[in-house]
């Protein structure tokens, strides 16, 4: 969906949803659409290949099974590039990439890999240390089993075989997705709150545009470490970093949508 103001400008926000999400799932989208369009900024929200737990994609005359349980993180380059090409065709030349949760990792990864001069700003809603999140919220038995079984199945040529993964709403994830993207030192592992405030992230250090970071003080996914550690880590790694905390907000900004809209309105 593309939301446009009555008087259109050349600026658009591209929203990238999180793990197993969708373009319409987050209830804050309607509020942000109103907030952005009142400022003369358009908003595009779209499904990427990590949408829902399992989904179907029509390629030619054949259906391919995709979804968050099967996606490879690196393929986000194709999804975001498609969205950017779409808005460029509509003559937008100032792009704000906005990610929520796992979408934050994707927009940072895209920015670093593509270095598109049309990208003028990043908005990160609830950026997570994915690997620490797994370690903290999975039982020790499940964590160890996922590590062992995913490696075994990938080696056997069975990356699409499902494993139990209690952090997903459907309780499943494919061996390949976990092995390639959720273990430490994989391509997603560049937000490392677990390493402390002085730890350096090349991917975050390389960002040369302003970054707005927003999360709640009740965000169970971001706050795998103390909130002050998270804030200092981000400030020490991102050159132009504006951090805004919403009191009482969880990872989905439940019942804090208006407050999120106010933060966006005051900081974009």
Give, region by region, the residue ranges found by the protein language model.
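Conserved alpha/beta-hydrolase "acid-adjacent" motif
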Residues: 220-228
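Gly/Ala-rich beta-loop-alpha elbow adjacent to hydrolase catalytic centers
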Residues: 99-103, 107
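Alpha/beta-hydrolase active-site loop
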Residues: 59, 64-89
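A short loop-to-beta-strand scaffold at the N-terminal edge of the catalytic core in hydrolase folds
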Residues: 1-4
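Short beta-strand/loop motif that positions the catalytic acidic residue
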Residues: 207, 213-215, 219
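Short, surface-exposed "cap/lid" segments of acyl-processing enzymes
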Residues: 7-61
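Catalytic histidine-centered segment of alpha/beta-hydrolase-like enzymes
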Residues: 249-259
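Active-site nucleophile loop of the alpha/beta-hydrolase fold
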Residues: 123-132
């Amino acid at each position: 969906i593309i939301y446009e103001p009555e008087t259109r400008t050349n600026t658009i926000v591209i929203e990238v949803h999180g793990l197993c999400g969708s373009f319409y799932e987050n209830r804050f989208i309607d509020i942000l659409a109103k907030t952005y369009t009142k400022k003369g900024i358009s908003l595009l929200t779209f499904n990427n290949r990590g949408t829902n737990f399992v989904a179907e994609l029509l390629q030619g005359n054949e259906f391919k099974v995709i979804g968050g349980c099967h996606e490879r993180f690196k393929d986000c380059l194709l999804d975001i590039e498609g969205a950017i090409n779409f808005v460029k065709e509509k003559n937008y030349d100032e792009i704000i990439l906005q990610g929520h949760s796992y979408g934050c990792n994707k927009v940072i990864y895209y920015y670093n890999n593509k270095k598109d001069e049309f990208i003028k700003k990043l908005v990160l809603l609830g950026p997570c240390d994915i690997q620490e999140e797994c370690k903290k919220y999975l039982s020790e038995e499940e964590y160890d089993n996922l590590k062992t079984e995913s490696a075994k199945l990938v080696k056997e040529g069975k990356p699409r075989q499902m494993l139990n993964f209690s952090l997903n709403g459907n309780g499943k994830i494919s061996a390949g997705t976990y092995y390639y993207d959720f273990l430490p030192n994989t391509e997603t592992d560049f937000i490392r709150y677990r390493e402390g405030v002085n730890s350096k992230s090349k991917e975050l250090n390389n960002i040369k545009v302003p970054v707005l970071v927003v999360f709640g003080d009740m965000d169970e996914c971001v706050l795998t470490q103390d909130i002050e550690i998270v804030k200092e880590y981000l400030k020490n790694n991102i050159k132009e970093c504006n951090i805004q905390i919403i009191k009482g907000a969880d990872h989905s900004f439940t019942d804090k949508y208006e407050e999120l809209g106010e933060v966006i309105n005051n900081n974009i």
